Amino acid sequence: MNLKISKPLLLSLAIFVGAGQLTGCGTTTTKKGEVGVERKQILLVSEEQMVASSEKAYSNVIGEAEKERKLNTNAKLTQRVRLIANRLIPQTAVFRADAPRWNWEVNVLESDQLNAWCMPGGKIAFYTGIIEKLNLTDAEIAAIMGHEMAHALREHGRERASQQVLQNTGLNILGAATGMGQVGMDLTALAMQVTLTLPNSRTHETESDRIGVELAARGGYDPYAAITLWQKMDKATQGGKTPELLSTHPSHGTRIQDLQKYAKKVYPLYLSAKKRYR
């Protein structure tokens, strides 16, 4: 039996779904850790779908970089970044028991951009520009690494993909009501989009800052390096175009105040952890 739904009802559903009114679906992807991040999230795309799509998208990015001879061109720098990642990855268990077993990948791409990112499931890319132009210390690289890992741990990409699904569902319902057809959804393209194109919200950025300093501290890196990092970023962006990494982040002043508070909170973790890496 075909259920017939009136156009006014379809339009109401489109508005309801498009507005994201599904608060009953909230879940928390991570444990609180010392920094206490525990916001509930709406996740409509399955974790398995998101990770599989991200793996494919990451493979495309790496394949293109390899073709253009821009992949891991500096062996020493690549090793340096991977060693830092290897110290931080075990610390992810504090927030998610499954995370250390993810299929983590870390690569360095030849690019002048001040950027780095981590796709769902632990697919990381650092651009040479951010390390070389800012003359980053290991602790400052760890601050960026922890921040980007935190996006994956909190599944911010999956959360943003879910928001896109909500919007597209609303459009499809609207299309059914108006006869305009449906909007397709390519999850691989979406995984690429939510990592490289769509901006994170300031909430996402603040969560990642806080979790990031804890990951760095637990890995034996001074969490206060996150502050010197953003001071360097501030200096690098004065009078110029805002780097992709900073395009939607909180203001430098707000961020530094928050980082000072949370770096102080996790500093004892750093003092304990650094003994293991002498």
Model regions and ranges:
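A Zn2+-metalloprotease active-site environment signal
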Residues: 2-12, 17, 21-278
